[in-house]
Amino acid sequence: AGITEVALKNHYADKTNWRKMLTNNVEQIDLVAERLKVENLIPTEVQEYFYSQKNDLYEMHYPVLHYPSKVNSLSLDKTPQFQGKLTGIKGQYLLFEDGTVFNIRGSEGYIVNINV
């Protein structure tokens, strides 16, 4: 693990709750306050690499028409064929109208045909 990762692992979880993310049940965070907190946790030997611009915030907007209330993960091993209406994309996930979500990265190595 890197120097920064080791320093931050006791303060931040390294896992995103993907089910909460895909139902849009996410906690709002004050990113400016978090940046200040992280800046104080970064070890001295890597502080020169810390981007410390105070006001640069970027907001990501994902094209999602409808978030499901409950998600059902699509496994190509269990369900080799699937048909559904795409209602959104969030990160590496495709979201479908019936609550099915497809993790693109989790299906690396598969050959997938998509018909639109």
Where are these regions (language model features)?
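Conserved RNA-binding domains used in RNP assembly and mRNA/RNA metabolism
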Residues: 2-116
